[in-house]
A protein has these predicted regions:
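N-terminal catalytic scaffold of extracellular/periplasmic and nuclease hydrolases
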Residues: 1-104, 108-137, 207-210
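Short, structured patches in soluble enzyme cores that scaffold and shape functional sites
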Residues: 97-98, 143-145
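Intrinsically disordered, low-complexity coil segments
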Residues: 45-51, 146-148, 160
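Generic structural signal for well-ordered alpha-helical scaffold segments
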Residues: 82, 169-173, 214
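Active-site regions of oxyanion-processing enzymes, predominantly non-cytosolic
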Residues: 124-141, 167-188
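Cysteine endopeptidase catalytic domains of the caspase/legumain-like
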Residues: 38, 152-153, 157-164, 168, ...
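Generic structural signal for bulky hydrophobic/aromatic residues embedded
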Residues: 18, 47-48, 144, 174, ...
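Active-site His/acidic residue clusters
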Residues: 63-69, 145-158, 177-180, 184-213
């Protein structure tokens, strides 16, 4: 993108693939929008045998996490992005709910698509906590969701409610192997807090991201 203010889709595409594209486009050539760009996560998975995990505190099909597994002409193709998630074969996904989980209502929802592709679809915190190494491909949708079907801000989370750090710990537990793993972790709620000019929420989520990295 040549925009002075690019969006999450084009900037995440640049991070994930090394290619520029237009705002709103996820991992596609900006001129024709019909040539996909391979992501670093896809390369590590296919060429090096790495296990791959994707985590976001916002919707798991939001532009930034999607830029590591999806290829779409527009970031608004939420259902199709969810289908690509299931088809990626990546071993671990965790975060907020799909934005258009039911698509147009004529086919299986994104949870069903993932299950059909061999994923354990976990929607409770207890279920997530019970997962152990060897569980297989796993999709965790946070049990406690806020507006926009994203995870709660760290400052709003109830006592004992899983936050980003917990999903990172679980991801490391499930992905650890002799060949290595790649775990993309986004604290998308920092972005949402800044859009809302909510300094307190932003600070708490920055601290939560710091805890997750440590």
């Amino acid at each position: 993108s040549t925009s002075f203010c690019p969006d999450s889709a084009s900037t995440a595409t640049a991070i994930a693939t090394g290619h520029k594209t237009e705002s709103g486009v996820i991992n596609m050539c900006p001129w024709t929008r019909d040539v996909p760009y391979e992501t670093i996560a896809e390369k590590l998975h296919a060429q090096k045998g790495y296990k791959v995990g994707i985590i976001s505190s916002v919707n798991i099909d939001h532009a930034t996490p999607a830029a590591f597994y999806a290829h779409q002409k527009t970031r608004k193709n939420y259902y199709q992005i969810g289908v690509e998630l299931a088809n990626s074969g990546f071993e671990y996904f965790a975060g907020g709910e799909f934005q258009k989980v039911n698509g147009d209502g004529t086919g299986p929802n994104n949870h069903e698509v993932a299950a059909q592709a061999g994923y354990n679809v976990v929607t409770t915190q207890a279920g997530a906590a019970a997962l152990t190494a060897g569980a297989g491909k796993t999709l965790i949708i946070a049990e406690n969701l806020a507006d926009g079907k994203a995870m709660n801000y760290a400052m709003d989370a109830a006592a004992g409610e899983w936050q980003l750090t917990d999903y990172v710990k679980k991801g490391i537990e499930l992905l650890d192997n002799s060949k290595g793993f790649f775990l993309m972790t986004e604290s998308g709620k920092i972005d949402w807090a800044c859009h809302a000019n909510d300094a307190a929420a932003s600070i708490h989520d920055v601290l939560e991201m710091s805890n997750a990295v440590q």
